[in-house]
Amino acid sequence: MDSEIKNQLQDSLGGNDDSKDDITCSSKSSPTMAASSVRERSTSPEGPPPPLPPRPNTLNLLDEGASSSRTLRQSTQSALQSRATTAVSLTDIASHDGGKESYPARGLPGTLRAKASLSHLASPRGSDTADSASVKSSVPQTDFGEVENVFSDFVATESGPMQHDSTGLLQFPEFQADDVDDDFTEEFEPVGDVGDEGENEVLENWKSKRKHYLILSAAGKPIWTRHGDGGLISTYIGVIQTIISFYEDSQDRLNSFTAGDTKFVIVAKGPLYLVAISRILESETQLKLQLEALYMQILSTLTLPSLTHLFSVRPSTDLKRPLQGSETLLSTLADSFTKGSPSTLLSALECLKIRKAHRQTINNALLKTRTNSLLYGLVVAGGRLVSVVRPRKHSLHPGDLQLIFNMVFEAEAVKAGGGESWIPVCLPGFNSSGYLYMYVSFVDLREDAGNVADDTATKEESVAVILISTDKERFFELQEMRNSFIEQLEKDGSLKIMKEAIDKGRPKTTDIVPGTVLHHFLYKSRGNVQFTMSSYEPDFSSVSRRRRLMSTYNNLHASIHSKHAHVRVHHCVSQSSTSLAWVTPVFQLYCVAGPNANRNALAHSASKIVQWVQQEEERLFIIGGAVF
């Protein structure tokens, strides 16, 4: 079985040829291209060509998978169109360059399950006896029954190249160089004030930043900037507003442009313009996703009706005062994008790896202590999701959870007052028109600390209990639920289990595949809208090395999701790394090795990672969650 999956990957990578140029990219090409080239050679004066060798079985397999994918789209199109939802879909915030067609991930035909998902290679047994009955194929089933996916409303709208499912050759003439020399030690330092230093020196500090985010109104008023202040950037704001207005006067909309090595991306949202200026290796689509997330952060404070009303009454409204206090959240969110955010790149969420039985125990404790006013309940440990309790017919939006995580772990005021907070918040994916009310409490996992965390506990040292209600008068009711829930966790040992899982950390690639050439990988389960990854240690421990790694992933992601790229396997070599992207209807795998890594060894390690994830699926991902 291992040899079968390995052979498929090797065929997709172009055989056993290990030769590579200084910077190269390769993808699985279409058999029709080979046939056409043979016909061209047959017309040469050198005589008839030798007979064609038999077509490899791998190409037949890929062609059959493509036809199955087309049959799937026809059979599910009417069901997807008739399904009502009020949630914001990933088409709005995570569409690739390939277009707006929806990818139906709810069910796959039987002919695709064994071939596209490679589920026939998964062990029938789980990781141990307790999980043996829980390990299931990573192919989303046709009918979820009573246990739906945590993000079920958003799976069907994920777009990508799999609509075409072709094996056409990727025309990518030159792979961009890595951020080899980038040093981010000063990227997040303040630029200074004009009063303290000379204006020219402050301006040079501002220009030296590799990435800027600007938010301005349609009237040209600066609202927020990651670096500097309104006075420093007012001239540049005026230039940007003039350029945008010029295109709008021509009945056109400016989305992006490039000047030298700098990319400018503009997103218009009603009365607001959000602008990203980047010299980091990121695609237009990736920068748009980041601007969309910043816009959702603004809506979480103001709500869409309030924002619209402010500018309808007074178009020149200064939004700084209504957003006062949210600047820190915008800045921390922007900095996470600059450092590199796998969650934003993949539009997915990471969960804490624990045994299925342990996760079910935590779910049962949430359901047992639940109050009638509870809408959503979340348990987050070490910055990763552990458990979710939700209504049966309501799903969570990944963008909303990203906002919650950013607010809970980055706002300094949240841990004040003994680790308890009561926060009004708008979750745009749930309802952009109104507020929900969020009770947040931290539990310190340090052995010398009590149950309640203080403001010295880091994100990795505490468990956050997040309880969300539609009623602003339910603080004490949710506080009582939290106390009962923590008491239950202590009784059944769940707090200790979470602490051990956090201390253990993410696995290294060599822990999963001994002797592997891989240094790091990202794996996204498309059906669960969740991802897992290996440890950054020891190769990517610094901020600059981690940024370089994310630049490699950005290039891989942009290449394989390009609108002209209908490939499943994409292999690239640059001066600092060898990387591989492998995309199927079931998963996305991105992995990075050293610059001299053998192509066959890379394919072998990738297949081993896929098998490991399938065996550990219900430890790595939350499937269904607790519903009521």
From Swiss-Prot:
Its main location: membrane. This is Vacuolar fusion protein mon1. It comes from Aspergillus oryzae (strain ATCC 42149 / RIB 40). It comes from the Eukaryota. Coiled coil: none annotated. Belongs to the MON1/SAND family. Residues 46-56 have a biased composition (Pro residues). InterPro entries: FUZ/MON1/HPS1_longin_1 (IPR043972), FUZ/MON1/HPS1_longin_2 (IPR043971), FUZ/MON1/HPS1_longin_3 (IPR043970), Mon1 (IPR004353). Keywords: Autophagy, Endosome, Membrane, Protein transport, Transport, Vacuole. The keyword Protein transport applies.
